[in-house]
Amino acid sequence: MKISLLGHGKTTLALGRFFKKNHNEVKFFDDKFPAFFKDSEGFLCYPSKDFNPNDSQLEIVSPGISFTHPLVMKAKHLMSEYDYIDSLFDHSFTPTMISISGTNGKTTTTEMLTTLLEDFKAVSGGNIGTPLIELFEKRSPLWVLETSSFSLHYTNKAYPLIYLLINVEADHLTWHCNFENYLNAKLKVLTLMPKTSLAILPLKFKEHPIVQNSQAQKIFFDKSEEVLECLKIPSNALFFKGAFLLDAALALLVYEQFLKIKNLKWQDYRENALKRLNAFKIGSHKMEEFRDKQGRLWVDDSKATNIDATLQALKTFKNQKIHLILGGDIKGVNLTPLFEEFKNYKISLYAIGSSASIIQALALEFNVSCQVCLKLEKAVQEIKSVLLQNEVALLSPSAASLDQFSSYKERGEKFKAFVLKD
């Protein structure tokens, strides 16, 4: 079979290895290739312009490639990673799938839920690191998948037993073109889910036509305290605060519903679940607090790549003066709602990256103190010279990092290095 993999990344490379083992003819197409070559694994790699849809029997697209890309527009047999994996399931092996999506919190919630489900041999994958084809080859019986809006957009058949949507706020508008498309991508899986499946959704989407018309069973939530109350757990029983408390509450809710489906009693598992969750450590670059040599507080929230994540971070330091490093690739999002919230805080801005001039203009409009630093190191230097002991320095950029860094992780690591440098 002639297979074209659109995009040369972690997901498609894992698929390429699988296809190669099964004696298929595999070609990669990517904008980053200026000419034909063979990569380190011997795969044939071509520039995107060389893709010929008539010389291909199956195309699988990297989730990061937009539906407006010429490769996708030309493809005649396009399939998502999720749908291809779904086509491999049969009576000998079909895993149970739980999908978690949302603008913010999906990585943390996926990791928390996987920890809770360890006794059921749960493994995490999808956006979180392990491609689905590798989970399939390992024959893992229970998959907890962090699922992006990109993957959901391209998926037309596959659906999970339980779908958790944590939140939907403006993000990835360059890819999706507008917020309506982004929201519809997040809700699309509900059109595929049967009566035997369960969707756990924010209350504000209860009246949305896609939600109303879905056959799936539905549970709606609003605040973390209400979720915990339903589970008969006092909120002080968990060692998390702010957005992380909601992540923990929702992980527990999915766990409770999974047990219910398995005809197991929640009360028999509740105490152990709390112990496991309270031992869980939040990952790097998510509200990661540290102190400089003078004992002043700095916070690495580099994973805050959108407005909502930054707003959640600000709430934590409501009663302190905040020195906020903001900027990067804002992905076509209007930052005005963020600036409207600044009136509730004592805040100074330090603008970096490709959106620095936009941030400066909004700061003038909303009368917010702002220094245009462009580079992260310059922003750190400026803050170092004025930061007081009772204040906080916060990197929560409300933007992607790829205009200046290889990833949000590199941005966070460099931030910490600049702060701790003499």
Swiss-Prot record:
Main location: cytoplasm
Family the entry assigns: Belongs to the MurCDEF family.
Location of this chain's protein in the cell: Cytoplasm
Enzyme class: ligase
Listed GO MF terms: ATP binding; tetrahydrofolylpolyglutamate synthase activity; UDP-N-acetylmuramoylalanine-D-glutamate ligase activity
Superkingdom as given in the UniProt entry: Bacteria
Protein name: UDP-N-acetylmuramoylalanine--D-glutamate ligase
HAMAP family to which the protein is assigned, alphabetical: MurD (MF_00639)
Cross-referenced InterPro entries: Folylpolyglutamate_synth_CS, Mur-like_cat_sf, Mur_ligase_C_dom_sf, Mur_ligase_cen, MurD
Annotated gene: murD
Species name: Helicobacter pylori (strain J99 / ATCC 700824)
GO biological process: cell division; cell wall organization; peptidoglycan biosynthetic process; regulation of cell shape
